[in-house]
Amino acid sequence: MDSVLNGRQSRQSLDAPSEPILIGLSGPSCSGKNTASTILQDYGFYCIDADAVSRKVFTEHEKEILNLFQAEAEKRGINLKNENGIDKKAFALLVFSDEELLKKHEAFILPIIEEKIWEEIKRAFTEKPERPILLNAPTLHKTSFIKKCLFILYIDAPFILRLIRAKKRDRLPLKNIWLRFSKQKKFFSQYFFLNADTIVVKNFWSSASLKRKLLQEVKKRGF
């Protein structure tokens, strides 16, 4: 934490900032965002996992989500229910197969997720105003947070490496993984067109190399 605070203090006066210091973390599936988040958390950042927030919101609003998509699932012969509630793999297959269904899902769930994340940002800021807050959010470009981030760390990795990681982690057919990846082809261009200060960090096999690159980038910016 001392390294983060000293860097921040070198950039501005010792007075506590008047608003949260937000830094975005994004990138395509299985590029290494969670590893990057852990590295920066160890360095002293407060890290918010938007996926974890999303999963919690999904569970809390399963009934509404089921009502929204049950009819479309039945048309496609997809059973959304299992003994635990909504079958998340079946649900992902449904929404990622149709752009309009994905938009419908995001229109419902993203505002709720944003509200929950803002609550956590406010708590973290109240505890330690000078501490940078890292927002690990794959779809950061679809939220209002992007305009409030000082800069964005965009983690990328070779396609084949991401494919291997996804297959090992999710145990889905390659066709399903390919479909999900295809929906993310324009991720980086979204940040470019939003004029966001985006830093691409390449993540290959070595976590040590990723750590070196990440710390080099944040130190350049005084953290």
Curated annotation (Swiss-Prot):
Cellular component, GO annotation: cytoplasm
DPCK domain sequence ranges: 22-223
Domain of life, per lineage: Bacteria
InterPro entries recorded: Depp_CoAkinase (IPR001977), P-loop_NTPase (IPR027417)
Pfam families, sorted: CoaE (PF01121)
Record GO terms (molecular function): ATP binding; dephospho-CoA kinase activity
UniProtKB keywords: ATP-binding, Coenzyme A biosynthesis, Cytoplasm, Kinase, Nucleotide-binding, Transferase
UniProt subcellular location: Cytoplasm
The keyword Kinase is assigned to this record: yes
UniProt family annotation: Belongs to the CoaE family.
Protein name: Dephospho-CoA kinase
Primary gene name: coaE
